[in-house]
Structures are given as structure tokens and as C-alpha cells.
């Protein structure tokens, strides 16, 4: 899968609502601090974590499929071996609800086969890249 161009990244960063799969309740962890940064930048962040009821004073959902509102971008902070299941949920939302325009896998997270399925469905994909780093670089 090709690396996203700066123009593609800028387009993805224009989305408003970001579901963060693996969002953490623990300050100091990337899965907490990066979503907090995104909130501070004006994004509507939706935490997805089955072990938390609330993160950042927002409802935390058990799975991506439980999020009732429209989601533009899914940002993933889970191990690479969990990506195929996450992509299944992304594709189900995309097919049934017509949302999820982009999938972003954070540093160290990669699965070419699973993300190719998302790309084949017309979803923009970024792998092994930090959304905060790219936001700071491009915005």
C-alpha cells in the first residue's frame, strides 16, 4: 500500500469526528495524550475502550460499532494483531452507515492485508504514523 502524500494527510486532518480505538484513561500514555491533543485542537474525539465508562468527560464506547454518532476518522492505538478485527468493524460501519472515511494506525501499528481491505472499500488509510506529529507538521 502506498504511503499517504502530504495532500492526502491534510485531507484526512480536515475531518471533524475521530473515534479513538484503544483510547486510554492514563495520562502519560500516547493513547491518552494524543487524543487529548486532538480535543485541544478542536476535534470531536469519541473514546472507544471497553474497560472505561468515560474518558475526557466523554462517554467511552465498548466498540466502534457501539458509537451512535457519525464517525469520520478512526484512529487506532491497539496492537497490530487486532487490526483485522478493527477493520471488520470499520467496514461494517462504512457499509451500513456510510461513515468512516479514513483509518489511521498509530506508530508501530501495521497490517497491510487488513488495511488493503479498507482501501479497497474506498477508505483512506494511514499506517505506522502518529496523527499528532503529522498534525503539527502540516497544520
PLM regions and their residue ranges:
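Conserved SAM-binding strand-loop segment of SAM-dependent methyltransferases
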Residues: 58-63
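Phosphate-coordination loops involved in phosphoryl transfer and adenosine-cofactor binding
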Residues: 14-15, 100
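NAD(P)-binding Rossmann-fold cofactor-contacting core
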Residues: 24-28, 37-56
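S-adenosyl-L-methionine-dependent methyltransferase catalytic core, i.e., the SAM/SAH-binding region
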Residues: 26, 33-43, 78, 121-124
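Rossmann-fold NAD(P)-binding glycine/threonine-rich loop
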Residues: 107-138
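Conserved beta-strand elements of the Class I
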Residues: 19-21
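Haloarchaeal acidic low-complexity proteome signature biased toward cell-envelope/secretome components but also
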Residues: 1-13, 139
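Mid-chain, well-packed structural core segment of small domains
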Residues: 64-108
